[in-house]
Amino acid sequence: MSSSNDHVLVPMSQRNNNGLPRTNSRAVRTLAEGDVLSFHHITYRVKVKSGFLVRKTVEKEILSDINGIMKPGLNAILGPTGGGKSSLLDVLAARKDPKGLSGDVLINGAPQPAHFKCCSGYVVQDDVVMGTLTVRENLQFSAALRLPTTMKNHEKNERINTIIKELGLEKVADSKVGTQFIRGISGGERKRTSIGMELITDPSILFLDEPTTGLDSSTANAVLLLLKRMSKQGRTIIFSIHQPRYSIFKLFDSLTLLASGKLVFHGPAQKALEYFASAGYHCEPYNNPADFFLDVINGDSSAVMLNREEQDNEANKTEEPSKGEKPVIENLSEFYINSAIYGETKAELDQLPGAQEKKGTSAFKEPVYVTSFCHQLRWIARRSFKNLLGNPQASVAQLIVTVILGLIIGAIYFDLKYDAAGMQNRAGVLFFLTTNQCFSSVSAVELFVVEKKLFIHEYISGYYRVSSYFFGKVMSDLLPMRFLPSVIFTCVLYFMLGLKKTVDAFFIMMFTLIMVAYTASSMALAIATGQSVVSVATLLMTIAFVFMMLFSGLLVNLRTIGPWLSWLQYFSIPRYGFTALQYNEFLGQEFCPGFNVTDNSTCVNSYAICTGNEYLINQGIELSPWGLWKNHVALACMIIIFLTIAYLKLLFLKKYS
């Protein structure tokens, strides 16, 4: 008669299909064995700049000679703020900048495989899930990109349904996660969704960065109970946490205490109180052990003062007791190194196969992908398009504003006449259309800024290539959001304004506005990619467009600008758009009533411009067809250049912490 807690025998080929090194060569093993992660002499240093006027580079040690072992179960990393717990977690998960990092992280006694970041799970502190999608759709996205294409769809759906059931998300499986504009699921359900995204690959090792942050005590307890159940299935769960309550603390199997980058305890969580008592720090009755440990480390516990008094009375020390935090941490660190628990850990580390071989910390490696570029492109484009439709504030609202603005401008410039005023108004409205296309494209700065954390997490986890993400976003988000407003704007305005009544002129104007929008959006991407704050990129875009307006050809005649500044006109997006629109509208037009365009005579007033051709010549615009199309060629070249810059910035973006 078996119980639900009995160990389940699973063939190794089925259990450890993520490619992690195995501890033995037996054909079967219990789930409770799992994978063992060990770390040897981990030291991490970073260079920080200090000073206001004179910036000096100072090396700061974040982690100092950390050794330990994480077995299947709940492995908690605890410590005060700035103690190094998140840094240690990132090092173990192979997500830390390799510069300044030394030491070895082994899996079952062997070096971490190149695809370790892809086959292990990592749940970030700030849940990075697409809020406009449902819980099921987010899991489907993870399954589509992280599971091999050889796996059939019904098998992927079965795994998704199993995870939803295991995480208790059945009631909200088809509910949207939620955004700042859309009401969604609760914080605990959102956290479980993030965990489910990582469980898709059935990882044997799961990392979580402060999984209880932002959750109330009851929800946090529920999340840890879920992790405890998962650990009993043979998973090695490693997480950082800050001040857990006792009901959570008693779930821990292993506890790692860090302070100022030094290891003050690493061993079974239930032996921690006994260990601190042997060091002279006794936990008060009814005190939370986790709070007690942090109080001792911070030096503000009554146990610390009692310990100092005992040391003074018993040892009759002549030196004054230190009042700062550092001596307490140093004493605890030295006591741990000389303790029996450290000796047991050291012996266990030495017994691991391959532990004596010094591998050295490997450099940052690119993720290994299980799907093709086209497969990734299709799913990224699909998710981006769903996100666009599920976010009406960014899609529908923009189209409505475009229609309203078009009607207002059409009413102001309604039915332009063929006279001097009509010529002036035509130039004015064409200039407005060009600049409006530029400034309305500033919203493109959010394309890669808002999803920066999401992109970095998914890229490191092996969801997709940088190229797949870039082109998928451009195809599904950038193109339609700039294409449709331009088409609507042209259709609403063209006939209200009474512009040139030819089919060619209509579509040339539409094409020109589309090209201007694409170029301005590409420039926005080139400036904003890699930025963390939208407002900075928006400010830079606005300043750039204001300077470009000066060289558009309306506010100042470009032929009158000095040669030392005239070269700036070739970098002006509005100039190319405005020039093309003027050529399209003014060529062959007559603006003097009764004047014959075919007549070579001039107007009675030699200072008057009676034809569109004269106006174009006065503006320095060529009358040949190349005078029109060279502007579109220039815009196309700028699009290619700006998108290339954006892609390279995304490619070389710092993707590790």
UniProtKB/Swiss-Prot annotation:
Provide GO CC annotations from the record. Answer: apical plasma membrane; brush border membrane; membrane raft; mitochondrial membrane; plasma membrane
According to the record, what induces this protein's expression? Up-regulated upon hypoxia.
Q: Name one Pfam family in it.
A: ABC2_membrane
Q: Which residues lie within the region annotated Disordered? A: 1-24
Q: List the disulfide bonds.
A: 592-610
Any one Gene Ontology BP term: transmembrane transport
This protein's source sits in the domain of life called: Eukaryota
Q: By what means is the activity of this protein regulated?
A: Specifically inhibited by the fungal toxin fumitremorgin C and Ko143.
**Where are the annotated glycans?**
596, 600
- Please indicate the ranges of residues that lie on the Extracellular side: 415-428, 499-506, 557-632
Specify the protein's topology with respect to the membrane: Multi-pass membrane protein
Keywords, sorted A to Z: ATP-binding, Cell membrane, Disulfide bond, Glycoprotein, Lipid transport, Membrane, Mitochondrion, Nucleotide-binding, Phosphoprotein, Translocase, Transmembrane, Transmembrane helix, Transport
Molecular functions per Gene Ontology: ABC-type xenobiotic transporter activity; ATP binding; ATP hydrolysis activity; ATPase-coupled transmembrane transporter activity; biotin transmembrane transporter activity; efflux transmembrane transporter activity; riboflavin transmembrane transporter activity; urate transmembrane transporter activity
- Compositionally biased region (Polar residues): 13-24
- The chain positions of domain ABC transmembrane type-2 read 389-653
- EC numbers on record: 7.6.2.2
Can you say where in the cell this protein is located?
A: Cell membrane; Apical cell membrane; Mitochondrion membrane
Q: Which tissues carry this protein?
A: Highly expressed in kidney. Lower expression in liver, colon, heart, spleen, and placenta. Expressed in mammary gland. Expressed in intestinal villi and renal proximal tubules, hepatic bile canalicular membranes, and placental labyrinth cells (at protein level).
Q: Which InterPro entries match?
A: AAA+_ATPase, ABC2_TM, ABC_transporter-like_ATP-bd, ABCG_dom, ABCG_transporters, P-loop_NTPase
- Describe the protein's quaternary organization and the partners it interacts with: Homodimer; disulfide-linked. The minimal functional unit is a homodimer, but the major oligomeric form in plasma membrane is a homotetramer with possibility of higher order oligomerization up to homododecamers.
Please state what the annotation says regarding this protein's domains. Answer: The extracellular loop 3 (ECL3) is involved in binding porphyrins and transfer them to other carriers, probably albumin.
The family this protein is said to belong to: Belongs to the ABC transporter superfamily. ABCG family. Eye pigment precursor importer (TC 3.A.1.204) subfamily.
**Role of this protein:** Broad substrate specificity ATP-dependent transporter of the ATP-binding cassette (ABC) family that actively extrudes a wide variety of physiological compounds, dietary toxins and xenobiotics from cells. Involved in porphyrin homeostasis, mediating the export of protoporphyrin IX (PPIX) from both mitochondria to cytosol and cytosol to extracellular space, it also functions in the cellular export of heme. Also mediates the efflux of sphingosine-1-P from cells. Acts as a urate exporter functioning in both renal and extrarenal urate excretion.
Q: What is this protein called?
A: Broad substrate specificity ATP-binding cassette transporter ABCG2
Name of the gene this protein is made from: Abcg2
